[in-house]
Amino acid sequence: MLPNAIQLISQAIKDKRCIAIRYHDQRQIRVVEPHAIYTDERGELVMDCYQTRGYSASGRPPPFWRPFRMKKITAVSVLKETFQPRITEGFSANRLKYRSGLVAIVQDSQPVFGYVYPSHTTEVGPHLPGKA
């Protein structure tokens, strides 16, 4: 594994920046949106990514989800291109595999919506009608 790969990719995850990687000594480049780095059940560091373009050993054309073993990444370049978490494509920060050994995970920047239930309100302040 590259000496500074974890730091570079963790920062890319935090900043929601795409990265270009070389994997397993292959010459071809893959462009991915890194969503999480975690330790799997075998104790290996894994990066979950949404690959948007570049080489695919399976021949399947991107885009698709793909895990990458950190120890097999031979080159990393952080790109200027940004991304939003792929919630509609299946990403969830609540997956069981992320609960232990999590190194970095993308934060969803979508607004949180809620409901106000009248039975759960509390009156505060003298500014309310009928208050002195």
Residue map of PLM features:
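Core beta-strand-centered patch of the WYL/Sm-like small regulatory domain
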Residues: 1-132
